Amino acid sequence: MQSQDPKTTLFAPGVDAEEALALPHNRPQAVEQPMHRREPKQVRATVLFGDIVGSTERLAAMGDHKWMKVLDAYYAIIHKGFGTFQGIHLSTAGDGFLATFDHPVQAIQCAAAILESVKELGLRIRFGMHVGECLSVDEFVGGLTVHIGARIAAAADAGEVLVSDAVKSHLVDSAIRFVDRGNHDLKGVPGRWRLFTAC
């Protein structure tokens, strides 16, 4: 079982890191925010969550300063991936992130590129992905689709891009292969969810 990451203790009781990534106050923002937002609009998006597996152990072994240098290199890699595959980086919590894409194939290609690039840093990353209707306002995206994506990421293993059946259904004609990972219970989400490893 994974030891608890520092990021899971940064939020209010009952709110874990995956949920926190979906909260608007965890995205980069100016010190002063307007007291109102524009009306949200419904959009269809692919949400991609990723985080470092075993980051607490790495931090403890390396020390704060060396670990921060690794994180700087890590975030440079993921931002390059977002730029290459047209992803939008929405929020960050600890070493985890949330991004959206117009199409699942872009998100899978981005995740694969990040996995390959972080090998030089000795990092193990896991990804979770879902596609569906979201509510978008300003630079914030929310809704059940986002939370499902977060829960899928929590079920992923190191080095895995774990996706929902909805993602797989969008890619029936693509060259991307999928390995059936069976049905899963996703915390707080009704029903059983069929998940697949994209490879």
What do the predicted segments below correspond to?
Residues 9, 31-112, 117:
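Catalytic NTP-binding/metal-coordinating core of nucleotidyl cyclase/transferase enzymes
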Residues 10-11, 27-30, 58-60, 88, ...:
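A broad, low-specificity signal for short, low-complexity segments enriched in glycine/proline
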